């Protein structure tokens, strides 16, 4: 089931959880979507600023599987 996250800080807390398996990054021409798969929900964060998206990509936990989709 999908859930939407509005804040970057909440997304980072969700990505650091023990049940977080992977992160998918979908890039469009006007926004970037970060989707983190946890045991129950797929959490989605939509960012319209490309620079913030790059910073967030660098601050993801190192043990998480990151997959970039075009």
Swiss-Prot record:
Q: Which InterPro entries match?
A: Ribosomal_eL38, Ribosomal_eL38_sf
Keywords of this entry? Acetylation, Cytoplasm, Isopeptide bond, Ribonucleoprotein, Ribosomal protein, Ubl conjugation
Q: Which GO terms describe its biological process?
A: protein-RNA complex assembly; translation
Superkingdom as given in the UniProt entry: Eukaryota
Keyword Acetylation tagged = yes
Sequence position, cross-link Glycyl lysine isopeptide (Lys-Gly) (interchain with G-Cter in SUMO2): 4, 9
The yes or no answer to whether the keyword Cytoplasm is present is: yes
Compartments (UniProt record)? Cytoplasm
- Which cellular component, as a GO term, is one annotated location? cytosolic large ribosomal subunit
One of the entry's Gene Ontology molecular-function terms is: structural constituent of ribosome
Q: Which residues carry this modification: N6-acetyllysine?
A: 9, 67
Q: Which family does it belong to?
A: Belongs to the eukaryotic ribosomal protein eL38 family.
Task: Give the multimer and partner information.
Answer: Component of the large ribosomal subunit.
Its biological purpose is as follows: Component of the large ribosomal subunit. The ribosome is a large ribonucleoprotein complex responsible for the synthesis of proteins in the cell.
What is this protein called in UniProt?
Large ribosomal subunit protein eL38
Native species of this protein? Answer: Oryctolagus cuniculus
């Amino acid at each position: 089931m999908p859930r939407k996250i509005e804040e970057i800080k909440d997304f980072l807390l969700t990505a650091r959880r023990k049940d977080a398996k992977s992160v998918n990054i979908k890039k469009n021409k006007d926004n970037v979507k970060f989707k983190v798969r946890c045991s129950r929900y797929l959490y989605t964060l939509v960012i319209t600023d490309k620079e913030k998206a790059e910073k967030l990509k660098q601050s993801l936990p190192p043990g998480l599987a990151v997959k970039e989709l075009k």
